[in-house]
């Protein structure tokens, strides 16, 4: 009987051993995933931008006016040079009509996509001892040709802020001085050390979405990609004004800028 009991016990042990080999090990409990870091809340001063309209392009048009009385521009003292002195001219720092339409304001789109520089050459002409045009924009990397069309010596002194970019004399009947400017967002100032009244400005931007207001204060920026943008207007004496515009495919968008005439420009 004792022998039978031992055999039964041995059988139980063997069966238990087989069951242990067949059972899979119990996996460890899953580790809880780390809680995601909460995103920073939008600043109250900078609300989330509105969704941009669907693709396409449109034009941005508008006018620039001066609501106060335009300052009187003095006659330029040009008689130090016999050629320049033949033509009387007024200072062109402020050019406005009697009803307040303001010329020579550079309007540009902020945040528009970058584009390659065009193959066209932008021109700065020295005519009648004045820079023409007085204000213009170029695409970063675009060739700029500076021409002397006068029968007198000029000196092209170009500044970025207070730093000289180049300073080069240009005698009559000589080839153009050609330059490429790549400083996106820079307003360059052109002077002539021979004729101190000569002044010109070139805005450099990495896309072609800019324009200059004409004698009637109007401007038009062609083919702006659809979207919501900040638009900035700059005047050499009155400084900057900003606005917003939403461009929709095939539809002109309009923005207007008003200067009071009492503003003072700061360095660009």
PLM-predicted stretches and their roles:
Residues 20-268:
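Extracytoplasmic copper-binding redox domains, predominantly the cupredoxin/blue-copper superfamily
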